[in-house]
Amino acid sequence: MKSILSSFIFLFFMAHALSAEIILQNPKVNEKAPLFSAVNSYGEKINLADFQGQPVILEWSNHECPYVARHYEEENMQSVQKMAQEEGFVWLTIISSTPGEQGHVNPSQANDLTHSRNAYPSHVLMDESGEIGMQYGAKTTPHMYMIDDKGLLRYKGAIDDIGMGMKFFSASFANATNYVATQLSDVKLNNKLAIDNTVA
């Protein structure tokens, strides 16, 4: 899982050192998810607050990360995206790679990735400054967050239990416990989650 924190932390502090309004956060589950706004890959401004009343999934992504690449090459991520949207979730894919760093894309390239991978995000958000990533403490890709219709963060962490290292590339997604896919209904129904926090 590719670390994204180091690639944008310097730019973030440089951009916001003089702003008293920016607060670095690492939200806890069952607390309010930090609000944010960003421009999507089509140039539209997207506000998390606009989705109040709908459950939301945040997916931090870097197409050059080998973990992300395998999830998409084997259509595991697309399968979960489709399941989530069928359950009424808004799926926001967030790209926090800074210019010149691994995984950085411009909006047109982001759209090309979505189409070439047959992905199902509701929006792809461009977070070049890393501000949203800092708000959520997103450190790896894929890093997943589930937010319920009341705006509470219900889950954060890995997408599944395969783990990191070489075992990831030999393990079967079919035999893994997918923390997002298996808990869609519970988040939607505001039920207590069996697992709400894992290491991404």
Positions of the model-derived regions?
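N-terminal "domain-start" segment that seeds a small globular fold
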Residues: 20-48
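Short active-site neighborhood of thiol/selenol oxidoreductases, capturing the structured segment around
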Residues: 48-69
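Structural micro-motif
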Residues: 34, 119-122, 138-145
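Sec-dependent signal peptide recognition
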Residues: 2-11
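Sec/Tat signal peptide C-region and signal peptidase I cleavage site
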Residues: 13-20
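Thiol-/selenol-based redox modules, centered on thioredoxin-like
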Residues: 148-200
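Structural recognition of the beta-strand scaffold that forms the well-ordered cores
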Residues: 56-59, 90-95, 123-126, 146
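Structural microenvironment flanking redox-active thiols in thiol-disulfide oxidoreductases
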Residues: 69-117, 128-133
